[in-house]
Design a protein with these regions (language model features):
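Residue-level signal for inorganic ion chemistry
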Residues: 19, 54, 90, 103, ...
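Walker A (P-loop) phosphate-binding motif
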Residues: 76-117
Length: 349
């Protein structure tokens, strides 16, 4: 079989180490070879008539010429579906990494492995492991059409990646698409507001309103869960996985989890001022969830970057209720300054 890989990042490099293939990437200017003897070619050199299977790097946009010319697209997940052990897929807008790490911790003693968008490509995961726990992006789900998990955990969805998907509706539909493929005997946990949009399905659906509702659904004692929002919801979903798959609630094991770097890391300086590093909060919803605990303080908020085409009006409507000053940076700085001015929010460009 003539296999073509699109892109040459972490995921495709791991795959190229396992299969004979030809790799196409925009950064290649001329043909060369990788360490395994695979051809490395410029994207323009791709000929669909000389390829039987095309596996795209998840981040390549659907409008890229390689995708438009491909005739046999297959996602990383679909390619490994025949050898994939029972799996938990974790998706949503925010909290995927933390929830995936927490869930893997709860199943680590039995040899469960974590991977996917969290950093370890499927090509590097042992297919003989009893369980894969995969952080799963909307990009991967967009290209996946056959693979399905034993348990799908969907965190809340808000406007994000519109520039990649073309619209929020397309982004949301990618997140929900896997449910249609899940067979009887599998389970999907999802936000209740998405229930009316779920496609025809055979799996069990468990819908939650918020953290309090999650705790009630699974009989979880939140007093034994040592995390505050937004990490509380992540922890409850990890415990829900343990409850569904093993009928257990390993509170003490969960309590040993340490929140990762750049996620609401707090430090006091010599003058007693609180600095919060929340640089993993890369979209509007994450910012909105981080601020309420500081409602009674004067906030200096550094904000900016690629907003991925999201509607930022709800963010600025909420920010207007805080005592704060914005410090705008990044590619959308002009847009942020205009919105701040419109909502009478002090800012420094």
């Amino acid at each position: 079989m003539r296999i073509s890989l699109f892109g040459y990042g972490t995921t495709m490099k791991a795959l190229a180490a396992r299969v004979a293939c030809t790799i196409y990437d925009d950064k290649f200017c001329e043909e060369s070879r990788d360490e395994y003897g695979n051809a490395l070619r410029p994207s323009a050199a791709f000929d669909p008539e000389n390829s039987d299977l095309e596996i795209p790097s998840p981040g390549i946009m659907p409008t890229h010429p390689l995708i438009l010319r491909a005739k046999h697209l297959c996602s990383e997940y679909d390619y490994f579906a025949p050898v994939m052990p029972p799996s938990v897929w974790i998706s949503g807008t925010n909290g995927k990494t933390t929830t995936t790490e927490m869930t893997q911790l709860l199943f680590a003693s039995e040899g469960a492995l974590a991977g996917g968008n969290i950093g370890t490509p499927l090509a590097k995961l042992d297919s003989k492991a009893p369980l894969w726990i995969l952080e799963t992006s909307s990009f991967t789900l967009h290209y996946t059409h056959t693979a399905a998990p034993q348990l799908y955990v969907l965190l809340p969805i808000v406007d994000d990646h519109a520039s990649w998907h073309g619209s929020f509706e397309s982004y949301r539909n990618s997140k929900l698409s896997v449910i249609a493929r899940m067979p009887s005997g599998t389970t999907a946990i999802l936000p209740a507001n998405l229930l009316p949009l779920v496609p025809k399905h055979c799996c069990e659906l468990i819908a939650y309103e918020n953290s309090a509702h999650l705790a009630k659904l699974f009989g979880i004692d939140t007093a034994r869960v040592p995390f505050a929002e937004p990490f509380l919801q992540d922890a409850l979903l990890a415990l829900a996985c343990a409850k569904i798959l093993r009928n257990a609630l390993p509170y003490e094991l969960l309590a040993s989890y340490h929140i990762g770097a750049h996620r609401q890391q707090k430090a006091l300086d010599a003058q007693g001022r609180l600095w919060v590093n929340d640089s993993k909060a890369t979209n509007m919803d994450a910012t909105l969830k981080a601020l309420p605990q500081y409602k009674d303080k004067k906030i200096h908020l550094i904000i900016g970057g690629d907003d991925k085409g999201a509607n930022l009006l709800p963010l600025f409507e909420a920010l207007a209720g805080y005592r704060l000053c914005l410090y705008t940076i990044g590619s959308n700085e002009e847009r942020l300054c205009a919105l701040a001015e419109k909502h009478a929010i002090p800012f420094v460009a």
